[in-house]
């Protein structure tokens, strides 16, 4: 199954890290293209990007200082299909990307994504730890499969947007 290319540039204000490309995203070749995925409206609502983008516009996030990547690059129908060694390899590769691209903030799209990366439990929101100098923010997963209500997702995305504005 296909994967998605990273959309990254050095010195971005934010890099968003997903778990891995979903089946639909891999088929259409764009991030967060799954039916019911709320990523793009939440990103706009939080003021992180100045216009409402769609998955087909994913490359444009770089214009707004936002990058996209995944912890595991192999597309699957669900995260349960990811092998333990893929998470281990993904941790190493993501650490290298964060060191190389040096974002101000790295946001993990889903608690499980950060927990697999950091190998520790966490709460949603801003974390006390930094990674290669980047502040770490954990968002609720935007997947349509996540039962977390839209109000909770919106609240954390807005907190991230406010945090980014305070950094400027």
For the regions a language model picked out, list residue spans one by one.
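Short, hydrophobic/glycine-enriched beta-strand segments
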Residues: 13-19
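Short, surface-exposed acidic-centric catalytic microdomains
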Residues: 25-85
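Short glycine-/acidic-enriched loop or helix-start segments at secondary-structure transitions
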Residues: 25-28, 115-119, 148-149
């Amino acid at each position: 199954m296909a994967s998605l290319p990273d959309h990254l540039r050095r010195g971005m204000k934010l890099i968003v890290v997903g778990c891995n490309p979903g089946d639909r995203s891999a088929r259409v070749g764009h991030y967060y293209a799954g039916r019911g995925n709320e990523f793009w409206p939440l990103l706009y609502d939080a003021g992180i990007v100045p216009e409402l983008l769609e998955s087909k516009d994913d490359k444009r996030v770089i214009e707004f200082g936002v990058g996209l990547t995944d912890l595991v690059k192999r597309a699957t129908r669900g995260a349960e299909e990811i092998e333990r060694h893929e998470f281990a390899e993904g941790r190493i590769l993501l650490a290298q990307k964060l060191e190389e691209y040096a974002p101000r903030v790295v946001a993990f799209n889903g608690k499980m994504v950060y927990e697999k990366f950091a190998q520790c439990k966490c709460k949603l929101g801003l974390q006390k730890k930094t990674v290669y100098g980047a502040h770490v923010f954990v968002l609720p997963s935007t997947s349509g499969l996540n039962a977390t209500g839209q109000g909770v997702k919106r609240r954390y995305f807005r907190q991230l947007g406010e945090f980014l504005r305070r950094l400027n």
